[in-house]
Amino acid sequence: MAKEGPRIIVKMESTAGTGFYYTTTKNRRNTQAKLELRKYDPVAKKHVVFKEKKV
């Protein structure tokens, strides 16, 4: 069974189109908007924006 609570697992997918993604958790109560983070994409070999997608 899934864990109950405010934290959910989200997939952060690269906007560079490489298909690379990170997984992280976010608190649904504090952060209701979709996440956008600038992280390193090892396939593109540079920092790009990662956007939240459904797992």
Swiss-Prot record:
Molecular functions per Gene Ontology: structural constituent of ribosome
InterPro entries referenced in this protein's UniProt entry, alphabetically: Ribosomal_bL33, Ribosomal_bL33_CS, Ribosomal_bL33_sf, Ribosomal_zn-bd
Superkingdom, taxonomy of origin: Bacteria
Cellular component annotations (GO), alphabetically ordered: cytosolic large ribosomal subunit
Keyword Metal-binding tagged: no
PROSITE patterns: RIBOSOMAL_L33
GO-annotated biological processes: translation
Keyword terms of this UniProt record: Ribonucleoprotein, Ribosomal protein
Family affiliation: Belongs to the bacterial ribosomal protein bL33 family.
Protein name in the entry: Large ribosomal subunit protein bL33
Originating species: Deinococcus geothermalis (strain DSM 11300 / CIP 105573 / AG-3a)
Gene name linked to the record: rpmG
